[in-house]
Regions:
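Accessory terminal helices/loops
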Residues: 1-4, 82-87, 107-109, 276-378
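Core dinuclear metal-dependent hydrolase active-site scaffold
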Residues: 7-10, 119-122, 131-135, 215-247, ...
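Active-site HxH/HxHxD metal-binding segment of metal-dependent hydrolases
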Residues: 128, 141, 149-226
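Active-site environment of divalent metal-dependent phosphoester hydrolases
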Residues: 29, 73-76, 150-151, 172-178, ...
Length: 378
C-alpha cells in the first residue's frame, strides 16, 4: 500500500492543492531550520522518527490517506511508511527526502515576451530562489543567477536549440552557492559577476564583469540585453533589462520589499546607496515594467500564473519605496533587519572564489530558506 513520490510530483501536487498532509519525521531542530514548502500552503506535522515508530497506532487514525512522509534522505520515512502500510494506511514516501527536495528546480515559462524571444523563471522551492534562462530559439541564451544544479538550464537551452553564451550573477550571493562559474566553464560561456562584490584580487574562475549599460546581443543582435548597476544589497548589485519592459532585479527589489544592505558589513553605507538606486534608477523606469526578482519570501508572492513577479508600480506602492526622505528610508531599513544566518559570510567567500567548500559543507551551508530581504510583508 505504501509507495514513493518524486520531488517534482510532490511540487505539482502542492501547486494543485492535493496533498492531504506532510508528515516530517526529521529531528525538531532540522524541521525548525526549514520545511518542505511550495506554491501553496500544505498541512505539515513534525514528529521525529523515534517517536513516530512508537505512535503508529495513533498515526493510522490521525494521518489522512495519501499523505507524504519525509525525512532527510528517504530512509527513515520509508521505514515508517511500511509500518503504516502494515496497519492499513496508504501513505507515500518522498524519494531522496529533503536532500532531494533541496535540489529541485522548476522552470516556469514567462509569457508576453517580444516575438522570437523566450524566457523561463527557474524556481528552487527549498531556498525560494529564482534564476532565469533567456534566449532566442535556434541562437543564443543567457542564464542569470543559476543554482549549482545545472541540468535544468542545459535542458532548457538544448530543447530550444540554444547555445548558452553568457552566465550572469547579479551579485555575489550570500544565501546559496552559485552554479555560475561551473556552468560557464561547462558550456564555454562568458561568466559575469560584479567585481565590486568579488574584490579585485584574482579569482579561481574567469570573470568578465559587466559595466553599467553593457549590452549582450542574442539572435544576430535581434534581441539585446542590458545591465544596469543598482547598488544597495551589495556594492555591485546589477539588474538585467530585457526587451519588452522586463527587469531581472536580483536582490535589489523583490515583489514585497528590498534587499538587505548589511550582508557585506556596510549596512548604513549600502542603505544610502539603495535609497539612490530606488529613487534615481528605478523610479524613472516605466511603472509597467515587470519586475522578476531573484527570491521570494512567502507563497503569497507567487502570482496566479505560478510566477514570482509584479509591476514596478505595485512595488512603489509600498510605504518603504515611496518614502522620499532619505533619513527615514535608511532608518526604516536598518531597524527592519533580522539577524543574518551565521553561514552567509562563508557562502559569500565561496561564491567570490576566496574559499573552497566540499559537497557536504555546501549542503550544510545551504540549509534553510533565503533571508535576503530587508523589508517584506506577509
Amino acid at each position: 500500500m505504501g509507495r514513493s513520490i518524486t520531488t517534482r510530483e510532490l511540487y505539482d501536487e502542492i501547486e494543485a492543492g492535493s496533498v492531504p498532509m506532510i508528515l516530517d519525521v526529521r529531528n525538531q531542530d532540522e524541521f525548525a531550520a526549514w520545511q518542505v514548502e511550495g506554491p501553496r500552503p500544505v498541512p505539515t506535522r513534525n514528529l521525529p522518527i523515534w517517536l513516530a515508530v512508537e505512535a503508529v497506532d495513533d498515526l493510522v487514525k490521525e494521518i489522512p490517506a495519501d499523505s507524504v512522509v519525509i525525512c532527510a534522505h528517504g530512509n527513515g520515512s520509508d521505514l515508517l511508511l511500511q509500518m503504516l502500510s502494515d496497519e492499513g494506511l496508504s501513505v507515500r514516501n518522498l524519494e531522496g527526502g529533503t536532500s532531494a527536495w533541496a535540489e529541485l528546480l522548476v522552470p516556469k515559462e514567462i509569457p508576453d515576451l517580444p516575438d522570437g524571444f523566450v524566457a523561463w523563471q527557474v524556481q528552487r522551492p527549498s531556498k525560494a530562489c529564482l534564476s532565469y534562462v533567456v534566449g532566442v530559439p535556434g541562437h543564443e541564451a543567457i542564464v542569470v543567477d543559476p543554482a549549482r544544479f545545472t541540468d535544468c538550464y542545459l535542458d532548457l537551452a538544448s530543447s530550444h536549440d540554444m547555445r548558452i553564451t553568457h552566465v550572469i550573477d547579479t551579485h555575489v550571493h550570500a544565501d546559496h552557492i552559485t552554479g555560475g562559474p561551473a556552468l560557464a566553464a561547462e558550456v564555454g560561456a562568458a561568466y559575469h559577476v560584479p567585481i565590486e562584490d568579488t574584490g579585485r584580487a584574482p579569482t579561481p574562475f574567469a570573470n568578465d564583469p559587466l559595466p553599467d549599460g553593457a549590452t549582450i546581443a542574442l539572435g544576430n543582435a535581434a534581441v539585446r540585453i542590458m545591465s544596469i548597476k543598482m547598488p544597495g544589497h551589495t556594492p555591485g548589485s546589477t539588474c538585467i533589462n530585457l526587451p519588452g519592459s522586463f527587469l531581472l532585479t536580483g536582490d535589489t527589489v523583490f515583489v514585497r520589499g528590498v534587499g538587505r544592505p548589511d550582508l557585506t558589513g556596510k549596512a548604513e553605507e549600502l542603505a544610502t546607496e539603495l535609497y539612490h538606486t530606488v529613487h534615481d534608477r528605478l523610479a524613472p523606469l516605466d511603472p509597467g515594467t515587470m519586475v522578476l526578482p531573484a527570491h521570494w519570501s512567502f507563497a503569497n508572492e507567487i502570482a496566479p500564473d505560478g510566477l514570482v513577479r509584479t509591476e514596478l508600480a505595485q512595488i512603489f506602492d509600498s510605504a518603504l519605496l515611496s518614502e522620499a526622505d532619505m533619513t527615514r528610508f535608511i532608518e526604516e531599513i536598518l531597524t527592519s533587519l533580522p539577524s543574518a544566518p551565521d553561514t552567509y559570510d562563508t557562502i559569500r567567500l565561496v561564491n567570490s572564489g576566496r574559499q573552497a567548500a566540499s559537497a557536504d559543507e555546501i549542503e550544510f551551508l545551504e540549509i534553510g530558506k533565503n533571508q535576503c530581504a530587508a523589508s517584506t510583508t506577509t
